[in-house]
Amino acid sequence: MKTAIDGKLARRIDRYSIENGMPSMVLMERAALCTAECVKNITKNNDLRKNVIAVCSVGNNGADGLAAIRILKADGYNCKALIIGNMELATEEFKAQLGLIHFWEIPVKHWEEDIHADIFDEYNIIVDAVFG
């Protein structure tokens, strides 16, 4: 696997963009569109089920994941969000994206100690929206 940029550089680029007038929600939508496009490319022209679960932190990485599954839901995918983290620490962007997830009636599950790995059984694509 080749890495174009690492997480540290990505954060610097984001910070520079925001400091120079680019709203963070615009950056988030762009990231979500790219993620959704990758998922569509993976499922295009094959027999993969279009079932996607996004594992989301309560920060802006998680907000990117929520936005991505919202876009995929609009394109006919079966989507679910699994939220990991304390909602009291959620960023404003995350809360805004979560509101949109509820509007689109996308199921949301909050991580609990008794969640088992079988939560992933019905999903063939997992979006990592925890790590940057």
Regions found by a protein language model. Give the residues of each.
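Positively charged, low-complexity intrinsically disordered leader regions
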Residues: M1-K50
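Glycine-rich phosphate/dinucleotide-binding loop and adjoining beta-alpha-beta core of small-molecule
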Residues: M1-I5, N46-G132
